Amino acid sequence: MKCYHDDFKTLAFNQNRIIQGYLSRIPERTVRIRIRDEKGFLTIKGNTNKSGLSRFEWEKEITSKEAESLLILCEPTIIDKIRYEVRLGQHVFEVDEFFGDNAGLIIAEVELEHETEIFEKPIWLGEEVTGQIKYYNSQLSKHPYNTWKS
């Protein structure tokens, strides 16, 4: 979901700087390298299901040095963002504010128990973009937000 203003920042109980790149961006298996707060991660994601709401994901922690070395091998563009965590009722929203080639884009995500679960929508939440591939981080690294036509 897109966000239209930054009220979420004052509500955040946690925030992390995230730098990430992709060794592979094909939909069947996206391979991501991420550095988050001095920790490295290697993540493999499978295809998204038909509803666009879930997919297989495997992640392994690696050293930040290993992640830095692997980022050099990644396809352009590297994603740079701050993730804010905002609790609302029983749910935690992860709100990503992007920088660099994706500056100006803010996207929120909430993990649900099942696809039809009802959740409280905060006033700062905007348009629903779930399942729209252009908003996937892997696609933002390939077709950055600043290249989109309005």
What are these regions (language model features)?
Residues M1-S150:
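Phosphate-end processing signature that detects enzymes handling 5′-triphosphorylated RNA
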